[in-house]
Regions:
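Terminal amphipathic alpha-helical/low-complexity segments used for targeting or macromolecular assembly
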Residues: 1-105, 112, 271, 277-330
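Short glycine/proline-enriched coil/turn segments at helix->beta-strand junctions
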Residues: 2-3, 25-26, 135, 180, ...
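Conserved beta-strand and immediately adjacent loop positions that scaffold enzyme active sites
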Residues: 3, 117, 262
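Surface-exposed beta-strand edges and their flanking turn/coil or helix-capping segments
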Residues: 20-21, 77-80, 86-88, 122, ...
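Extended beta-solenoid/beta-helix repeat architectures
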Residues: 90-198, 214, 240, 258
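Glycine-rich hexapeptide-repeat left-handed beta-helix
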Residues: 155-156, 168-329
Length: 330
């Protein structure tokens, strides 16, 4: 490491921020108030910001992910920014004649996308349809919305504002202000709202999450940093699910539920609102989901998509298993 620019990953890049970071020279840093955004350092240099030439970031376009719930809460704005960056200077594929579209100039369709007999309403925000993505007939979508490459919206889906569907993922039923990462499936009826779903997850048919408490109170969410339930400041907050987790048919998740990595949830009733990584069970209790069994499933799931489960993948998940052991009971 002779020279490096370190970047605070919680800041979502904007054109102004990227330009400023690219202009950094040795011993220079960019701060937002007391928080470092980026700094240029060398191998022999200690990270002592008193010795740095500090530039204060003064633009009003800061978008920062400070908590897990920010991923969905700030997704409306993130989609609008990305839409501008991805589409500027480019021409969309034509909107099919069989599709009903509102505010067409706010809709961008990549090559190979299929969207017959669907409704696209970009009045409240842009709609982006990725390469080789498909929106099946009868689906109704409101922007801001992003459907990434080779992702699928199943027939008669209802998708409200602020949703992003990651590459190669499949969604159906009803979604509102939710983010699914790549290669995850919510392919059937059921409601997912104010939620974040990691990669390689699968939600069984008629899985539902609550995103509003019956008493309309502020939602508290498990926080790994404090090892307790944090105040979100939100009235609407649904499900946070880590990579490789699965749930069976008719699973019900309570308001503000956090599911860790590689958990397997099934059965009737509401499971607890914090399910540690590598948990196996449901409302009746949890046992430990052994890594050898979890890895067998991951290999099968990933192979179906033509992707190898590598030694690096296994090492990462083993590390997560060890780090989260303190929260598992069985």
């Amino acid at each position: 490491m002779e020279e490096n620019i370190f970047i605070n990953a919680s800041f979502i890049p904007s054109e102004n921020l990227v330009a400023l970071i690219k202009s950094l020279k040795k011993n220079q840093a960019v701060f937002l108030e007391d928080e470092p955004i980026a700094f240029f350092t060398t191998e022999g240099q200690e990270v002592d910001f008193d010795t740095y030439e500090v530039t204060e970031y003064t633009h009003d376009d800061v978008l920062r992910i400070e908590h897990t719930w920010d991923i969905f809460a700030k997704n409306h704005e993130a989609i609008q920014r990305d839409f501008h960056l991805v589409t500027q200077g480019r021409t969309s594929q034509p909107i099919p004649e069989t599709a009903v579209a509102f505010n067409k100039e706010n809709i961008f369709i990549e090559e190979g996308a299929k969207l017959p007999l669907c409704s696209l309403n970009a009045t409240e925000g842009p709609i982006y349809i990725g390469k080789d993505a498909e929106i099946m007939e009868g689906s109704a979508i409101r922007g801001p919305f992003a459907l990434c490459e080779s992702a699928t919206v199943k027939m008669n889906a209802k998708i409200y504002t602020g949703c992003t569907i990651g590459p190669h993922s499949k969604v159906g039923g009803e979604l509102n202000n939710s983010v699914l990462m790549g290669y995850s499936n919510k392919g059937h009826d059921g409601f997912l709202g104010n939620a974040v779903i990691g990669e390689w997850c699968n939600l069984g048919a008629d899985t539902n999450n609550s995103n509003l408490k019956n008493n309309y109170a502020e939602v508290r969410l498990w926080d790994y940093e404090t090892q307790g339930f944090a105040r979100t400041g939100l009235q609407f907050c649904g499900l946070m699910m880590g990579d490789h987790s699965k749930c069976g048919i008719n699973t019900m998740f309570n308001t503000g539920t956090v599911v860790g990595v590689s958990a397997n949830i099934f059965g009737s009733g509401f499971p607890r609102n914090f399910i540690p990584s590598f948990s196996w069970g449901g409302s009746g209790g949890m046992t430990t989901y052994k890594t050898n069994k979890a890895f067998e499933v991951a290999k099968i799931v990933m192979a179906r998509r033509g992707i190898e489960f590598t030694e690096a993948d296994a090492a990462i998940l083993e590390h997560v298993f060890e780090e989260t052991a303190q929260w598992r009971r069985g």
